[in-house]
Regions:
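Regulatory cytosolic signal-relay segments
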Residues: 1-29, 187
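Catalytic NTP-binding/metal-coordinating core of nucleotidyl cyclase/transferase enzymes
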Residues: 4-5, 22-104
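A structural signal for short, well-ordered beta-strand segments
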Residues: 34, 84, 129-135, 206
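Alpha-helical scaffold within the catalytic cores of cyclic-nucleotide enzymes
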Residues: 58-74, 90-131, 135, 156-165
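Acidic/histidine metal-binding catalytic segments
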Residues: 80, 121-130, 173-179
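Catalytic strand-loop-helix junctions within cyclic-nucleotide turnover domains
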Residues: 87-97, 131-149, 170-172
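Short, surface-exposed loop/helix-turn segments at secondary-structure junctions
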Residues: 120-121, 143-155
Length: 215
């Protein structure tokens, strides 16, 4: 049970431990929404700052982003340097996982703007996130040896979120058609055209989420 605290919110852990919420870590097929966030401009910052200056910045960034993810019911898959892979809809079922993922992305962008001003002040330095989101069926569950289990997702849909984040411009949130179909009336969304991704036989339409439109 201690392992739960590393990838879901303390509130969810308490609900599970009290028996108020069911969960399932065994491998299964499920429709989830995946989010991949990539921090842009951080590599150049690494080259300019000393480790003792850099560590507090990265730790604060990851802490703040994780808190936002947990607030929206997300599950941390893994941290990849300054990147974060997360998913919504497991281990606790959530019908609003596409909406919660997009809301998370916009909240992450807003928080980074605050942090950037705190860290860099008026310095003219580019620092922002590119975020990719997709909704689809993946395999989700606990994998690995007993000594190092990980609760993670696998499948082509999980990879698409990462590839969307890579083509996203700084401070841009890109989503797939399936995610767009589920949240298009809640957010202002702009179609950007077809893109070809590795592992897909046909091009895929990509959408840019600008802002929420729900009152």
């Amino acid at each position: 049970m201690e392992q739960l605290k590393t990838f879901i919110s303390p509130q969810m852990v308490n609900l599970i431990m009290s028996g108020q919420m069911n969960y399932d870590f065994s491998p299964r097929r499920a429709e989830l929404t995946m989010l991949f966030s990539d921090l842009r401009g951080f590599t150049s910052l690494c080259d300019e700052l000393e480790p003792e200056e850099l560590a507090p910045i990265l730790n604060e960034y990851l802490t703040e982003m994780t808190e936002i993810i947990f607030q929206h019911g997300g599950t941390i898959d893994r941290y990849l340097g300054d990147g974060i892979m997360t998913f919504f809809g497991a281990p606790i079922p959530d019908e609003k996982h596409p909406e919660n993922a997009v809301s998370t992305a916009l909240a992450m962008q807003a928080k980074l703007s605050e942090l950037k001003e705190k860290w860099l002040g008026d310095a003219q330095r580019e620092l922002g996130t590119g975020i990719g989101i997709t909704t689809g069926y993946v395999t989700v569950g606990s994998f690995g040896p007993k000594s190092h289990k990980e609760y993670t997702v696998s499948g082509s849909n999980a990879n698409i979120a990462s590839r969307l984040s890579k083509i996203a411009e700084m401070a841009q949130v890109l989503i797939s058609p399936r995610t767009c179909a589920r949240v298009g009336d809640l957010f202002e969304v702009e179609p950007l055209g077809q893109r070809q991704f590795k592992g897909r036989a046909t091009p895929m339409m990509v959408y840019h989420v600008k802002r929420t439109v729900r009152s």
